[in-house]
């Protein structure tokens, strides 16, 4: 099988920044995309935008040269999840994710569904603990260990299933690199440049701190999308990362 749209797992750009394209209006999203360079970032499409605009939005972004992270966090029975991941591969997305809490059989099925795509397969990432959750939130659902411990447990399971990495808090990055290895990709939301509001994220870091901790890809939303000059803000963040030893 080959992607009908675009091959996106080529590592063609070096930027670690993934901009969260969180808009309720497609025209606004595409207007933003037209203000930034696909050489400086990738774009993340989540549940709201994909529910509203579907595969057409992904194709529009691909036509503009962007790699797309399809952030739908699939969590279902193994067969359904596998089919959903294969559908994402058909769209040619660069990255797709599932919930690690769906278990080993679900994650293994998702990984197997991508085998026919070979080098054209998207990166398959698992979500460990949402960065909006803290220890109290975990206790509310019967998990008595800390967010860091739960993230490590699920990251190990993800690694055992052969996935490419996990979505995690930057606070867990150092430990997860030690446990799962340098080639295991860490994708981190909750990244806020110095002086930005935390919003609904509870466990946050600056871009510089995230890179120093070993994060491979950092998701940044409002500090860039709500900037009066998004490309300038994006390049300022990239410049700050070159100073990280």
Swiss-Prot record:
Glycoprotein in keyword set: no
GO MF assignments: orotidine-5'-phosphate decarboxylase activity
GO cellular component, one term: cytosol
Binding site for substrate: 22, 44, 71-80, 131, 192, 201, 221-222
Matches recorded under InterPro entries: Aldolase_TIM, OMPdecase, OMPdecase_AS, OMPdecase_bac, OMPdeCOase_dom, RibuloseP-bd_barrel
Biological process, per Gene Ontology: 'de novo' pyrimidine nucleobase biosynthetic process; 'de novo' UMP biosynthetic process
Keywords linked to the UniProt accession: Decarboxylase, Lyase, Pyrimidine biosynthesis
Keyword Lyase annotated: yes
Active-site residues annotated for this sequence: 73 (proton donor)
Family: Belongs to the OMP decarboxylase family. Type 1 subfamily.
Cross-referenced NCBIfam families: PRK00230.1, pyrF
Complex formation: Homodimer.
Protein task: Catalyzes the decarboxylation of orotidine 5'-monophosphate (OMP) to uridine 5'-monophosphate (UMP).
Protein name, as recorded: Orotidine 5'-phosphate decarboxylase
């Amino acid at each position: 099988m080959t992607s009908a749209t675009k091959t996106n797992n080529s590592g063609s750009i070096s930027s670690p920044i993934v901009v969260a394209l969180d808009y309720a209006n497609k025209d606004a999203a595409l207007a933003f995309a037209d203000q930034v360079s696909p050489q400086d970032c990738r774009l993340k499409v989540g549940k709201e935008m994909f529910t509203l605009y579907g595969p057409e939005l992904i194709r529009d972004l691909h036509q503009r040269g962007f790699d797309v992270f399809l952030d739908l966090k699939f969590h279902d029975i193994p067969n359904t999840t596998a089919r959903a991941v294969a559908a994402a591969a058909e769209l040619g997305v660069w990255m797709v994710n599932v919930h690690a809490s769906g278990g080993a059989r679900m994650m293994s099925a998702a990984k197997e569904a991508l085998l026919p795509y070979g080098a054209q397969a998207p990166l398959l990432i698992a979500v460990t603990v949402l960065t909006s959750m803290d220890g109290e939130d975990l206790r509310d659902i019967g998990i008595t260990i800390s967010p860091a411990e739960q993230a490590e447990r699920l990251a190990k399971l993800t690694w055992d299933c052969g996935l490419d990495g996990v979505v995690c808090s930057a606070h867990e990055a150092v430990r997860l690199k030690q446990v799962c290895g340098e080639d295991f990709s860490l994708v981190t939301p909750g990244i806020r440049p110095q002086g930005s509001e935390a919003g609904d994220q509870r466990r946050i870091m600056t871009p510089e701190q995230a890179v120093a901790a070993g994060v491979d890809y950092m998701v940044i939303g409002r500090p860039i999308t709500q900037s009066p000059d998004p490309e300038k803000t994006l390049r300022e963040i990239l410049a700050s990362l070159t100073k990280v030893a």
